[in-house]
Amino acid sequence: MTDECVTRNYGVGIRSPNGSENRGSFIMADNTDAKGCTPESLVVGGATAASPLPANKFVARMPVERYASEYNMSHKHRGVALIFNHEFFDIPSLKSRTGTNVDAQELKKAFENLGFAVSVHKDCKLRDILKHVGKAAELDHTDNDCLAVAILSHGEHGYLYAKDTQYKLDNIWHYFTATFCPSLAGKPKLFFIQACQGDRLDGGITLEKGVTETDGESSTSYKIPIHADFLFSYSTIPGYFSWRNINNGSWYMQSLIRELNANGKKYDLLTLLTFVNQRVALDFESNVPATPMMDRQKQIPCLTSMLTRILRFGDKPNGNKAG
């Protein structure tokens, strides 16, 4: 259903005279591609760029060395995982999501196996979702590796549905930016979204086999964007349906759960999510013979990553689940 403005002169990637890359050096002032903005109109972490800010406004603990290739996943706790499971709605046009409880229960177990402290919230109104998210953002995540949030609901392009109304995902994830939740700064914040993003169908295409087959120095501190280290994994691409079996759960969630259980401690997360894509793309096809237009349709998940390092869950000692 569903002209340029000048920024501060921070830059990276220039070459020193000997040809080595000096990743921490400054270059001349950069320009944005935004139209008609002025420094006074820019919003930085909830305040205009021209507004005076406290000296420690955007200072947080460094969880890993500046150019580390992997996230630090050896904190005392894995972290908090929130699951928002929507089956019934107050909105007349939205049908109940039979089969979603299978997804929620099995995803909870998969998260727990990775060491997360999991809480499941069923059929929440938007105000309750924001309440739970706000409470999670207020926690001290200093001793946590990361954060995970899963939303299982109806959706359309750009929107998700709570029990009583629609909302945008950024209403949720902005709570966990470095501005509002500094103890998660520099740590992975993972969002898994099972919902339609439109009403288009993917009929797929049949493939036939042819004749032939063809490091820099560490520093004591560094600055990161407040929106860094997020990952959003969606069950389908923008504009398209997302499929769910009323007995077995949704294609995407079941594929995600199987990969987390089988390879969650073996592969890095982006590799794992690539194989989630593979499972959904190859192992599923809609079975709606009574409605030919809907029958034998396909689906492909997609993701948006602002991660800045490799993420591997690895083993977490028992008893260290609490976030």
UniProtKB/Swiss-Prot annotation:
It is an enzyme of class 3 (hydrolase). The keyword Protease applies. Its EC number is 3.4.22.-. Gene3D superfamilies: 3.40.50.1460. CDD domains: CASc. One of its GO terms (cellular component) is cytosol. The keyword Thylakoid does not apply. Pfam families: Peptidase_C14 (PF00656). The active site is at 154, 196. GO terms for biological process: apoptotic process; cellular response to starvation; execution phase of apoptosis; negative regulation of neuromuscular synaptic transmission; negative regulation of Toll signaling pathway; neuron remodeling; nurse cell apoptotic process; oogenesis. It comes from the Eukaryota. Keywords: Apoptosis, Hydrolase, Protease, Thiol protease, Zymogen. Heterotetramer that consists of two anti-parallel arranged heterodimers, each one formed by a 22 kDa (p22) and a 13 kDa (p13) subunit. This is Caspase-1. It comes from Drosophila melanogaster. The gene is Dcp-1.
